[in-house]
């Protein structure tokens, strides 16, 4: 019976040449007879090894062998990925449009196991997930910027390390739209702008002290906001490299900020400070329109709550418990101004170990004028709930894409997941998950941003969020590590 030929004639010739090429340096003078015999067996003329039909490639056999191993590993990885996807499909429901969505994806939180850990040589001060690529970025106390590839097997070597600043990097942020520019700010008083390939393209100078935090406008890649220990809030044009506006928002060190954009009124800036307060400002005019006062220590960070789910839960809670909020006019909860503004509630975290949830009074709107301080409650926000559970400073916050989970990181070395819907059941925002894994203070956390998408209707928003969610969550700590949670 004729033996089945697996290789073509050309492939067979290439393999024979590669075998002789591999054995030549191994066969010393004493073994040249053996090499000649093998060459004759394989029909190879050593004097004409470099034939017209076969191109000689150095270390050909070794390279082919390593390629096979890499391909085998890739096949195993793909088989595992297919298995995971099949598991997801098997546990899904189909919506009316035939789009298959995971039952639990919209409420995904980490189980608590560390999927991957990345170690730096210095304290990790800030972390950020790339908005599109499988990359983890972190800044360190020594000014180094690290870029790690989640898909790499070797988690000991970063994809890239950049000496970005001369002192600690305090915050990293990406633009909200493509191309994804990166900005970093530092205790060296500067802000640096980087292109999509992490090449430095510009340095922004203007702050007179530590630059604490930065964030891009959600609607304009050219606009960047920053806050500093010099108490100033600055608005930058990153392409021109100039400061467009500067205004003082606080009496002490300005720690953090969050930005939300309104189609009608432009950007609003929420800031917090060592003066134990937070402030809402209209970006274009610099006017303060609302204040948040109630913490007993430094306010470390602030976040707007997205309208998705949060507004409905909190409106219902206030309506059912009017005796607890006698100064909140119920008609205010239905004020359509909030729809135009894009914000209604926010959260703050402090060194008093608490997180507080606030209803922001809407600014006064007058024709042909920028928004003015609110006429409600002397422009003071109403405290709706206090989240207690951390035993030390709460320094980082993020909001789950579903809009109802709040995530916090603390100096007590824990990360907590809070469920707003607990207000309707128990009257409290309950902790639904606490994850522990760091040996030092939690300095920063980040949940993967939703994939970019076109505008969708309100009723389709939850489905769109579920489809666009990336189930990735990271944390950075004073123990010099970044952890990607499973």
From Swiss-Prot:
Coiled coil: 66-99
SMART domains, alphabetized: WD40
Subcellular location: Cytoplasm, Cytoskeleton; Cytoplasm, Cytoskeleton, Spindle pole
One GO CC term, this protein: kinetochore
Keyword Acyltransferase: no
Top-rank taxon, per record: Eukaryota
Matches recorded under PROSITE patterns: WD_REPEATS_1, WD_REPEATS_2, WD_REPEATS_REGION
UniProt keyword Coiled coil present: yes
InterPro entries from the UniProt entry: Dynein_regulator_LIS1, G-protein_beta_WD-40_rep, LIS1_N, WD40/YVTN_repeat-like_dom_sf, WD40_repeat_CS, WD40_repeat_dom_sf, WD40_rpt, WD_LIS1/nudF_dynein_reg
Signal peptide boundaries: none
UniProt repeat feature WD, residue ranges: 119-158, 164-205, 206-246, 249-291, 294-328, 329-368, 389-428, 437-483
One of the GO BP terms on file: establishment of mitotic spindle orientation
Assembly and oligomerization: Self-associates. Interacts with NDL1 and dynein.
Protein name listed in UniProt: Nuclear distribution protein PAC1
Native source organism of the sequence: Candida albicans (strain SC5314 / ATCC MYA-2876)
Recorded name of the encoding gene: PAC1
